[in-house]
Design a protein with these regions (language model features):
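Short, small-residue-biased leader/transition segments that mark boundaries at the very start
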Residues: 2-17
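Long, ordered, helix-rich scaffold segments
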Residues: 18-245
């Protein structure tokens, strides 16, 4: 009966009162733009642990923007909280492969330039490019122990089928390949190109070979194979422009 007649009484475990991070708009379906004053640590916590997939993606997007803009403006290193949060997401095999592939993406250089302009800063394309490349290199190093497993586990060995399951697995394995190529000089990309039974896998491998500086033969072989298909050749031209230094 102790405390029952008190006007105010408290009961519970001490750890319940630790500081909490709110997952605002969880499960909300309307297109709401919410401004939150969250620390990088809070955003990284939500990125790693939130049960709402959109909220996780949004916190990852905000952290990626903040990290890249800090690198561009002040020469900072990539945000370690963001890298740790992304690591938690891509290593979670309960999550959809396509979703994890999306989480490995970065804001485009044009979006970064727009964000700088809107903030009153003058975008420098060379600095934006360097920050983006440094971030991808940091991701390749931070996830080095996870990437080979992700690539092998989600490489599709079955005959090509245009379904969501295979597309998601291909997206994740190709996202992993893009980072792995930064540390293996394109060896794995060459293996994928040689073994590919569809254009998607070929094109992904080709882009990585070009990035690694060893794509000349593959570029010629791809042209010879697909030169009659105008849409595919548009992709062929595009990747060479995008990967050009």
């Amino acid at each position: 009966e102790d405390g029952i007649r008190d006007s105010v009484a408290s009961r519970g475990r001490g750890d319940v009162y630790k500081r909490q991070v709110a997952s605002v708009l969880r499960g909300f379906s309307a297109p709401v733009v919410l401004t939150q004053d969250l620390s990088d640590a809070d955003r990284a916590h939500l990125l790693a642990h939130d049960t709402d997939p959109f909220n996780r993606w949004e916190q990852g997007r905000m952290l990626a923007y903040g990290s890249l803009l800090g690198m561009i403006r002040e020469g900072k290193a990539p945000n370690k909280d963001w890298l740790a949060g992304i690591r938690a997401v891509i290593g979670d095999e309960t999550l959809d492969p396509a979703y994890r592939a999306l989480m490995l993406g970065l804001p485009s250089q044009s979006d970064l330039a727009r964000a700088l302009s809107e903030a009153g800063d003058t975008p420098d394309p060379d600095i934006i490019y360097a920050a983006t490349e440094a971030t991808r290199a940091a991701m390749a190093d931070a996830f080095a122990d996870l990437l080979p497993t992700l690539y092998r586990r989600h490489t599709v060995d079955a005959p090509f089928e245009p379904n969501a399951k295979q597309a998601g697995k291909r997206a994740l394995s190709n996202a992993a390949l893009s980072l792995l190529t930064r540390n293996d000089d394109g060896v794995l990309a060459q293996e994928q190109y040689d073994a590919a039974d569809n254009m998607t896998q070929q094109l992904s491998a080709l882009a990585n070979l070009v990035r690694a500086g060893r794509g000349n033969k593959a570029v010629e072989a791809f042209e010879a194979q697909w030169k009659a298909d105008r849409l595919v050749m548009d992709k062929w031209f595009g990747l060479q422009v995008m990967e050009a230094d």
